[in-house]
């Protein structure tokens, strides 16, 4: 865009701005290329005329038009097109012509782009990034002080307040994340960023991209082409690509990238294209037509479908899944590897010239990683970009694609410079990379205290640990380091900076274009989430039916007796419509992580996001409110005047808009599901209690009257009541009185009697709608996402980090012990294969049976997907495994490999018995006996890829629980603890024993620590057979080596282990004994030994005619996947599966399977006297123990709920102050009953809502643990239910004591105990109902949608809005099964059911009024108490039943 860099004064003038460059000229004219590109005599006359006509257009029009071939094959008609109106189909066809195969044609395509610019002397903008003496410091909690327990959360809150008021200092300790780092990132060079976990890689990338958080202490400077960060907009000049994949799951891959491209704009491409077009015209140069169309289409911003989107889809290999939804935890979408590529592509579609990419290869196989990095490298080198890429386990061939290396360790730069000199530097330091070791793997390990010694090659000097500071100091004196220092000492010549290099405008396109983009996306998401709106409409329809049949006009007269009932119907309408907006809260919170990411990347300002979410809901509101009002108004018997009908309709529309805006605002400030689900009901309760229905305006205390005037519901109540009761139906007068029936009813409830209050109320609701939307916009504009980027760290880890940064050598007894242990644990191939040394898991203490697993002709199929059936596929089932056979044996480590879609995880799930659906055929035997899943679960372990663990327990507690549940009961407690310690030492988790597990990507353990915990959780079960699904995915080389060393040691104890693996390095791949290789479609193509240095594998495939030989030093795993690809099969005309089945190897495997399928003489089948290792009672105790820890360390649930309760207690206590003693008037009793009704309903709903996210998280863990045979469903449900009892008891006591004393109910032991009893069981059954709703539904969203429908029914039939004696006889039965009705019965009857004082002006006692008006009898309290217990037990039982019987996990 012109505004983004500089406005070109006149594109027809030879502006000096566009011509100065490194030597004073940016765009030098080329004299050599022009003649070769002039019109040729033999060109087609018609085409020449068409081009000539296009050339005659003004430059502004010419850059929007091009000549496009209408068919991808190249033989179609050429037509003139407006590139701004090209559709997705034309864009795909164009890209298909330009880049037929990304591997072969991408570089040629880029060279064509560059050649076109070179011919007229235009350079692409470049950026040189410099960072000098950069220091980043964070404040962290150390040790157990950082665990988020209930106590710690309270202390943290108090200290944070004290710190903000400068009363008390912070108790956090400083931790240096980056220490004195300096360097230069050159354009046209690919830079690889390496370093062990915690080295500061992500922080460095964020610092270079200008995205560091404000709460960090930062010193030093980062410059782009000599310009400081405050001189341009770094978020738009550079693109930071996060390691976390945050996307809207309902959008397809193409839609996600297209939206990103639409928001980011085209940068300087339009200005450069205009200059290019002007120069080409001046020199009579005709460009390649496809290149011309591409460059013009890519320079037009704001398009719904962009040619750049199609280009990025192509080079990232996402074109095959472009129309598949991205998906999330609740919606199946693309694979994890594809989702990672979507994250990368989301930023590549933009115009940023500098790329900072954080772990972009997680979940990708090595060949895909190579292709993506190669494509990015081609773009960087040819078009002059700048890139720093952090990779976890780069294969040697991927490593060789980089020009420069930055090695970071403990926040210091150990090396930065050309790749060719890195090994030279470390050899000078005394360390040498072994021959078959990847250089990247060597670099990740050489600075680690645990791995360093194995690489020491100086025999003349004894090894001593070299700390990071010593490396960093040595690098500064190394010739590469000196060269960087010399270059940094001379400032960058800012005059060399291309005017288009740095972005100076905050956003990529105009505000209106961004608003339109967000409107289009919101419409798309509303369409994709249409089931939510359908369900809300259905819920309103059901509620309307209940209202019509409960408040039936034929049963109600228009007099003062039934005026209260009509008032209840109006209030219920307000309550229903108000609560209808509650669904916005959950939907808003779920979209916020993506919003915050895109806001911080400057995709759009917050208001362009918030306005569509409000405006587009208005038509929906009109429809939803219409469903309710149009069906109920005349049936209930409201005033028949048409104008009053439409006025009620408009008022409820305004109320619904206000409600939706309120809950969006609460979601915006809460930013967390549990917190928002807590404060949502709190606001609803406050507005309702002060709305004038529960407590009439004259009875509101003077200190709360301001609350009445700011409550939106008070205005709604006045408006809807005056609209109804000033109508003709209520216009009858009492004899001898001036007031009509309607006015009398209004006065009795303290409601204004003037007609103007309708319009005052309506205006107030519109005002509140605008206010809440404004506050929502402000919240999203300035608030940051919740979460701590730098959580607590163990004390030892912080000491070691500081020692490495200062060069200090820790010297203590503990250090000497750990040094000895570390030396014995060095990552060494020789050590991996040393069986004698590796039998660390004590077979003597915990013996196990050595078991083999064989399988023959395994087929797995699923019902044919509807999408394929729609495409004409006639088969009923889709076959995913096609007769797979093989065997896994004790002491043999088998790698299960294949490209994505080969069926690796599917086969493993089938063998492990983890499939929940589909059809399985074939034979599986365990040491010769048919596999029985009940016994197999006892002797097997399964390390899932997703690392699912309870987030609120520590590492040690996770292992204790697993061992407790899975080891035989004969193993005593001491032996079990010793075994756990042994496993922790083996997997190197000892230093993390007290670390909280946390949620992936949010807090707690890092990816590699979580992966090691997954392995350890299975190892402590002492299994005979272990399945591991991608145990090294997402890990760096050193962490992968730790995991594989653990696996190797496990195998060497005699266990049977099989691992699926994606992109192994050479040494990790060759740590395996055998390979089970599958191809896409679910067939095996090699099953056999690897051999020394993979010799047998290489010999087998090189023996196939046409297969290329492996190059020296090449990774056999990568080579194997490349030569067996589908493309290779098509090129060679062979089928690797058929070749394997004709081989001698296949025959030998068949014989082995036959042998292993026959029991050995004297052996017996697996048998256990019980299904589970532990007794039912022990399972219950263990599950309760784990839930106790989880609840104590989940303050966002327990502490926030308690805080909510205290606030409500104080609110109600002060609002209804001393009303419990007032029993002289009916209104006094209505007020007291109203306080009970509101408390029960809203605190109960809050309990029910906020427990649901907690249950959802733990249920996912439960599915894994139950599948592992740890326990049955009931003990888990028992633990979840039982742990709520003490927490709700505290909640009840806090609420009960405060409210009972402040409201002034009668202080007798019986009444107080009854009050606490009914409140306790009410909160229990509401909480258990929330659990039950989750247990019976697939996910939290469905539970949150279904629950309000139940709450509505409970509210309506509670006995407050319409007393039970006045409920129509056909609905009266429901009162007996409505729990809230029983709660109100118990509370009211226990407090007022035995008061014999008479009401003022009536010959009726309080007890008689309670009995006659409400139908409550004091002498039936025992029955009410029993019913409360029954409801509580019933909901708990239904939750337990759902947990035991339903499995919503789909595998």
UniProtKB/Swiss-Prot annotation:
GO terms for cellular component: membrane. GO terms for molecular function: ABC-type transporter activity; ATP binding; ATP hydrolysis activity. Residues 162-435, 853-1105 form the ABC transporter domain. CDD domains: ABCG_PDR_domain1, ABCG_PDR_domain2. This is ABC transporter G family member 32. It is a multi-pass membrane protein. Its main location: membrane. Belongs to the ABC transporter superfamily. ABCG family. PDR (TC 3.A.1.205) subfamily. It is found in: Membrane.
